[in-house]
Amino acid sequence: MNDRVELQTEVGAARALVFPLVATADGLRRWLDGATLDPRVGGELRVTMRDAQAVGRILALDPPQHISFSWDWLERPLGVASVVAFDVIDHGARTWVTLRHVGLPNAAQVALHEEMWRHWLDRFEEACRALAQLA
């Protein structure tokens, strides 16, 4: 069974600018509707995406290249443990970002989460462009 979403993007900003967008509360708020994050392994994460909130705990943190956290919806839990990971790979003035969301319970949830992450990654790319222009 395919229980995962995996998406990749390449952005025109240095990794030093990109990693904080996935690993700090201020960075997440640049492309999500809201976020709180305790940036340490075991720290709590809470994000708002439109009218939904997701919660989790930081599972791994290896700046400036990797963060992963558990993920579940506050109002409508998935009923399984799922994990979101971002890998941020330096490529000179550009950065490759891979998002993986694994442990989704069924094909319908995979499809819903893929659509959701595509939307939010578009906003992530916009935030990267804005930061690159300021740098």
Segments and roles (model prediction):
Residues 18, 28, 45, 58, ...:
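Hydrophobic pocket/interface hotspot
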Residues 33-39, 48-96, 102:
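Hydrophobic-ligand binding "helix-grip"
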Residues 1-36:
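Hydrophobic ligand-binding cavity/cleft-lining segments
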Residues 20-33, 63, 118-129:
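Short, intrinsically disordered, mixed-charge
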Residues 2-4, 98-103:
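A short small-residue
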Residues 17, 83-85, 123:
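Alpha-helical elements of Rossmann-like donor-binding domains used by nucleotide-donor carbohydrate transfer enzymes
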Residues 103-135:
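A conserved amphipathic terminal alpha-helix motif
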Residues 2-4, 8, 13, 43-45, ...:
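Charge-dense, helix-prone N-terminal extensions
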